Amino acid sequence: MTLRFGSLRVPTTVHWPGVETVSLALVLTDELSPTDPWVEGFVVVALAAGMPGSIELEALQWVSEHVGELGAESDRMLVAGGARAARLALATRDRGWPVLQRQLLVHPAFGLKHPMPANVAGAPPATVVFRSEHDMGRRYAARLRAAGVDVQEVHDVGER
């Protein structure tokens, strides 16, 4: 697990479309890099690639217990990544802790390794970044919305 503070300013103010200005902690699964420019300004806890899902839950629990020491607010936490982040967000729903402000899903790729969850009712609000109209992320956003979850969709037209 890697801990990084964006620009060494903690707590920090973050502006994200559709979300009020907040100070928050971000648990980043291995689909994204803590050096991606969009994570600048977040208190980031990044998990190494290939870590089992139980480690993600343990990391999220640790962050929720130490969020004040990290300079963020306990009610301002989110998870980010792809399919693993979506499953982590659902695990928080199932356990009732910690309460996530949002899940940020960037090009979530569901498949054999990470099948698309069937029961998404009660999931945290989501921002889903997708590449095309036929993207799995777009389908997952529709599934979340149909279950009554607040969803913001962002069409990524750039190359990654």
Where are these regions (language model features)?
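Domain-scale detector for complete catalytic domains at protein termini or as standalone homologs
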Residues: 1-160
